[in-house]
Amino acid sequence: MPVEFATNPFGEAKNATSLPKYGTPVTAISSVLFNNVDSIFAYKSFSQPDLLHQDLKKWSEKRGNESRGKPFFQELDIRSGAGLAPLGFSHGLKNTTAIVAPGFSLPYFINSLKTVSHDGKFLLNVGALNYDNATGSVTNDYVTALDAASKLKYGVVTPISANEVQSVALLALAIATFSNNSGAINLFDGLNYSKTVLPLVESVPEASILAKLSKVIAPDAAFDDVLDKFNELTGLRLHNFQYFGAQDAETVFITYGSLESELFNSAISGNNSKIGLINVRVPLPFNVAKFVTHVPSTTKQIVVIGQTLDGSSPSFLRSQVSAALFYHGRTSISVSEYIYQPDFIWSPKAVKSIVSSFIPEFTYNADSSFGEGFIYWASDKSINIDVASKLVKALSLEDGKFVSLRTKFDNLANAGTFQAQFVTSKEQIPVSNIDSTKLSVVEDVSLLKHLDVAATVAEQGSIALVSQKAVKDLDLNSVESYVKNLGIPESFLISIAKKNIKLFIIDGETTNDESKLSLFIQAVFWKLAFGLDVAECTNRIWKSIDSGADISAASISEFLTGAFKNFLSEVPLALYTKFSEINIEKKEDEEEPAALPIFVNETSFLPNNSTIEEIPLPETSEISDIAKKLSFKEAYEVENKLRPDLPVKNFVVKVKENRRVTPADYDRYIFHIEFDISGTGMTYDIGEALGIHARNNESLVKEFLTFYGLNESDVVLVPNKDNHHLLETRTVLQAFVENLDIFGKPPKRFYESLIPYASNEEEKKKLEDLVTPAGAVDLKRFQDVEYYTYADIFELFPSVRPSLEELVTIIEPLKRREYSIASSQKVHPNEVHLLIVVVDWVDNKGRKRYGQASKYISDLAVGSELVVSVKPSVMKLPPSPKQPVIMSGLGTGLAPFKAIVEEKLWQKQQGYEIGEVFLYLGSRHKREEYLYGELWEAYKDAGIITHIGAAFSRDQPQKIYIQDRIKENLDELKTAMIDNKGSFYLCGPTWPVPDITQALQDILAKDAEERGIKVDLDAAIEELKEASRYILEVY
């Protein structure tokens, strides 16, 4: 049975205009977006990429709403600069654009959206969501989203109940559309609202409400004006704050968050204590005046339920509440706070515990407040994972009853655990974490070793346990039968005895039929939960079965009658005394076992992916086979690609110029190379890099093939590294020249892989020693002193001869080498320039060795062709040509600065007023290594470069470095960097980074001194990096 049914037995919503009776709150929210906006950009989440927009995606693939046409829909990945696509799309449009995104992604949107300069408006539909790396759990993180909203200055609205999610979404859309801000955020419980199935009973305002609002709201209205008009026209009461409880309350709790608000509201409902509750619906802007009006005059204590990321610092909500009371003279009220982190597990008992810690006399009846709850536990790979959904579907058919379902996956416990919690009640209630159920069904005994199942069962409740081992021949009056024969942990038996929980064993082994076992588990549930007889159990099961099922009600009844007699056993209560007396023996040096978790640690939205795809092995082929495939391309699905082994788009370019720029007698070979890209369609931007797919020296490859005994014309088929089902066909010569790094440095795992192939025992022993800790010194000598290549190793170990098919898997592939582009395409539309240094050294044998890629490129003759690709970069010019540019670099790190200066030249030629350009460069000697020196001087004379600060470290007795040149111009750089909002770039090796960063801090410190303020210089540097005004391109 598909996972989709196990998590939602009612199926997907077919369209956005007519929602089903049951669904998730996220589906309800999505319908508002789909019906009221013209464009939607949805960003993927982790684990289940379309978690927050799967309905939007499905609806957009269909015809959509006939009367208005479907909105534009685009699904995107989360990355730096998120938001640029909708920002560009909305340019020139006056409609509101919807962005659907998980809360953890909002920091990536800040730079894109905080400076919207056109008329576009944005509604961010955000599910509070994050991932806790420490615990491996999925969390409801409101803090990250609220922090981003504050930086964007967007208003935020959050539903305080699942019964108002559509209305709040529509309100957020109205605020985004009509308020004087460029956007608003609908922030909701992303975790529970996407994974809880419940009745969709909300009465939604008519679609024309937005049109009506446009007629009565002044342009660029204030947030509260839009809110008030929305409530007035719809008749709703979606105010900033909602008060519940006693009007003479002495203690008032403040909550923010969808589930939190519902649970506290349910907890204090009907309580006679002097308790009040304020749910925050609008956290931003926090209206302090309105908040104070909701605080009863009798209030003595306010308790803020605040979320923080670290669990210690005061929450955002606490600071707002304290400020509101201070500004309105309510300082006699004490303010306390209960702080919780995003991974906090909310449940009725948790709420009771929190309230009781502030009001000891507080009591409430959790069972009556939260309906009847049940828990189903199973392995996430079980064929019976859908049992709970079948039960929920049957419960939903009862008149006058509501049912809610919340499913969870823990990919770690028991190698994959599934839990379904479902509640039936006379009114819709929240599903959090059931902590006191009268019945749990456990489908897999092994789960009891990983989770404290009994802890969430009420005293004198029941547990139905499915055993995959036969029960019928066991002595059920013996403790040993349960522990040794059925594998039930002793700790579990002790727990059920302590709480007097009834235990029923379902004999899953003897049932011997998975489909019938499912029927019987359902029947046991109906019997234990509601006391139904066989006839009524059959009736409930029959109602929930698919109409096409090949089974009759009579056969179900007949099977259940026998099953209850033969396959269900109740553990005798008389045995509980023996359970209580069990003494779990602990070995002498064994530590006290850790307590089992009570609740599932929700680590994913999907089952554990425990299947391993079988990867086909490389194989050799005859030329005739290749000829056959090329002759019948359609039949064999042959594709002809430039480099199918590479995931990026590639281009073939020609060398136009290749010249050395350092003297021939100088020990560093640095060269400038230009490629002709005419007709290739290749484009590049400032700051990007060119990936060179270099080849091995063909004559050296042929030498190796002859030595190894390989035929260069043989054909080898290698699985594509991105899609193992695709086979790439290469000749042996092609593979070793273009694909395999045969002259590269082998890693440790290569030596390990050679051991099985060594036929000589002495060589085998040497290889084995190399990969042990004792052989680390020799291995390092092989790699970093002798610089042995793959080819060298096969010479050193002549008995090691893997086959061709094995060679292509154990030799690492050639990697593309990336070089910063030294040209602007606006100035050189059909060229791309690079500045490269040839890496060389002399090994222990006296051989001159070279870096594979740099040497290959330096030897290219004019007219040579090679494969290249473009790599994006974080290095960009400031948004305005007027903003200054400060560049510092060493050696070939000057390459991107040539591109920047050319771009500034182009800007000036187009009539733009350009800002100051400072260039700081460094090398050892001016005569040998003043790279592009003549160009820099010419650009300075032309008024493009403002100042050149050249530091040639060895041309004078004292060493001079670029940071020294920077410090000589602190006044000018302060004006350029701080006053005129310039950008600072550092390119080249990593070692100058601390010194250059210190020089930049000196600039910031000078500004702070002039303004008479104190600045955290480290934080200021980080802010510059975040704003892309301090950019490091180092290697």
Swiss-Prot record:
One of its GO terms (molecular function) is flavin adenine dinucleotide binding. One of its GO terms (cellular component) is cytosol. This enzyme catalyzes the 6-electron reduction of sulfite to sulfide. This is one of several activities required for the biosynthesis of L-cysteine from sulfate. InterPro entries: CysJ-like_FAD-binding, FAD-bd_FR_type, Flavoprot_Pyr_Nucl_cyt_Rdtase, FNR_nucleotide-bd, NADPH_Cyt_P450_Rdtase_alpha, OxRdtase_FAD/NAD-bd, Pyrv_flavodox_OxRed_cen, Riboflavin_synthase-like_b-brl. CDD domains: CyPoR_like (cd06207). Induction: By methionine deprivation. FAD binds at residues 684-695, 814-824. Keywords: Electron transport, FAD, Flavoprotein, FMN, NADP, Oxidoreductase, Transport. The lineage of its organism: Eukaryota, Fungi, Dikarya, Ascomycota, Saccharomycotina. The gene is MET10. It catalyses: hydrogen sulfide + 3 NADP(+) + 3 H2O = sulfite + 3 NADPH + 4 H(+). Pfam families: FAD_binding_1, NAD_binding_1. It comes from Saccharomyces cerevisiae (strain ATCC 204508 / S288c) (Baker's yeast). Present with 1580 molecules/cell in log phase SD medium. This is Sulfite reductase [NADPH] flavoprotein component. SUPFAM superfamilies: Ferredoxin reductase-like, C-terminal NADP-linked domain, Pyruvate-ferredoxin oxidoreductase, PFOR, domain III, Riboflavin synthase domain-like, TK C-terminal domain-like. One of its GO terms (biological process) is sulfur amino acid biosynthetic process. Its cofactor is FAD; FMN. Its EC number is 1.8.1.2.
